Amino acid sequence: MIRTESGALGGHDEENRNLTPRILVKLSGIALLLSGILATVGFFIHPHDSAPSNRGIWLGAHILVIGGGLLNLLGLVGLYLVSAAQLGLTGLSGFLLAAVSLVLYLGKLYWSAFIYPLVMARDAAFIRSYGFTPGSEPVDPTVRIVFYLGPILFAIGYALLGLSLLRVRAYPAPALWALIAGVLLVGLWPLLPGAVQSLGVVVSVIYTTGIVWIGYLLAKARDVVA
C-alpha cells in the first residue's frame, strides 16, 4: 500500500541524492505516466495505410510507441513491487503476464518499425502473401498465435494486477477501473468488432487516463509499504 502527499514530486535534499526505494518508486510512477502519453501520441500520428509512402511518420510513431512500451515495462515493476506482499498469487500472475506481453509487443514493434518497411519496399508481394500488411491477419498459424498472444496477455495480465490492487485498496477505485477498462480495450482490440475498433480515440483516452492517473499517484508516493 502507498500513501501519497500533496506536495511536489521531489523529496528532501539528502534523499534526492540517493536512489532510495522512495525515489525508485517515484521514477516508476513517472515512467508509467510518460508511457501512456508516448503510446497515445504514437498511435494518433501512426499512418495506418502504407509504411513506404510515410516512412518518416511511420518510424517516428513507432519510436514513440516503443518508448512507451519500454517505460511501461519499467513502471510495471515498481507498480507491482510496492504492493507485492499484499497482492498474492493473482497479483504476481498478473504482473508476470503483463511483463511477458510487453516483451512480445516490443519485438513486434521492432519488426514493424525497422524491418517491415524495408521488406515492403523490396518485395510487397511477399508481405501481402503472408498477411503482414497493416490491418491484415498473419496467414501462418504460428505467427498468428504470437501476433494475438501479446495483446491478449497484456489485457489479462494488467486486468489481474489491477483487480488485485483494487482488492487491497492500493489506489482510488476510479483510477484502477479506468486502468482495467483501458488495458482490456487496448489488449483485446484485434478481437473486437469493427464498430468498436472505429472508436480508437475513445479507447486511447480511457487507456491514457488510467495509466497516467496510476502513474501520477505512484510518483506522488510518500511512504512505501511492501
Task: Give the residues covered by each predicted segment.
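Hydrophobic, aromatic-enriched alpha-helical segments typical of multi-pass transmembrane helices
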Residues: 2-226
